[in-house]
A protein has these predicted regions:
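Solvent-exposed beta-hairpin/edge-strand motifs
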Residues: 138-153
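C-terminal beta-strand-rich structural cap/linker in extracellular carbohydrate-active enzymes
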Residues: 157-176
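A residue-level signal for conserved active-site and pocket-lining positions in enzyme catalytic cores
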Residues: 61, 147, 168
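Aromatic- and carboxylate-lined catalytic core of secreted/periplasmic carbohydrate-active enzymes
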Residues: 56-101
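Glycan-recognition surfaces
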Residues: 1-73
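Carbohydrate-binding surface patches
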Residues: 55, 59-62, 67, 102-141
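Short, glycine-/Ser/Thr-/acidic-enriched flexible segments
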Residues: 45, 66, 73, 115, ...
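Active-site-adjacent structural elements in folded domains
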Residues: 44-46, 104-109, 158
Length: 176
């Protein structure tokens, strides 16, 4: 299975994610953030489906310049949608790392949507095995709020505070 194979490309994703979230506060203050190129194609790409979704999520949350490295005419429709999301909604959120000093690569990125101030949180698993992360969702969303994952549509209650993630995946939680 694709998810089980060893991936030599994935480490750069976590390192770039560490850099872009740790430097996010400088975006539009000292410079315009310039993360790495977005790659969504299936051919000539070592990233798994989960890793591509994780990378897209990170770019969506931090904003900044968007460089697409794919020919839209050759992209599978579901992959083209990932790139279109980034192009249609640049600088959608104002994000920051909640766990900046708790781990080498921050895994919990809180954000507010710039258009209306609605809260959002990205929870990332950059590790090579499944993780259950404790996330203080109540402080971000309030008590008893139903949250929905942007990618899967799954819902959880903010009171749970536990987010289970397979390796190299993420969720983007917003109010349902």
């Amino acid at each position: 299975r694709e998810e089980d194979r060893a991936n030599t490309e994935a480490p750069w994703v976590s390192y770039v994610c560490r850099n872009i979230i740790n430097r996010r506060y400088m975006h539009k203050r000292l410079w315009i953030n310039d993360p790495d190129v977005h790659i969504a194609r299936k051919d000539n790409n070592e990233l798994t489906e989960n890793e591509i979704q994780l990378w897209t999520s990170a770019l969506w949350l931090v904003g900044g310049l968007v460089l697409i490295s794919d020919r839209f005419s050759t992209l599978a429709p579901e992959r083209a949608e990932l790139s279109k999301l980034l192009l249609a909604q640049t600088d959608t959120f104002d994000a920051y790392p909640v766990d900046l000093f708790d781990r080498e690569i921050p895994a919990i990125w809180a954000a507010k949507r710039n258009s209306d101030g609605a809260p959002c949180v990205g929870v990332f698993n950059f590790e090579d095995d499944a993780q259950t992360l404790d996330v203080d969702l109540v402080s971000i969303f309030g008590k008893g709020v139903t949250l929905k994952d942007h990618w899967t549509g799954r819902t959880i209650l903010s009171d749970s505070g536990k987010v289970e993630l397979p390796k190299h995946t993420c969720v983007i939680l917003m109010k349902a």
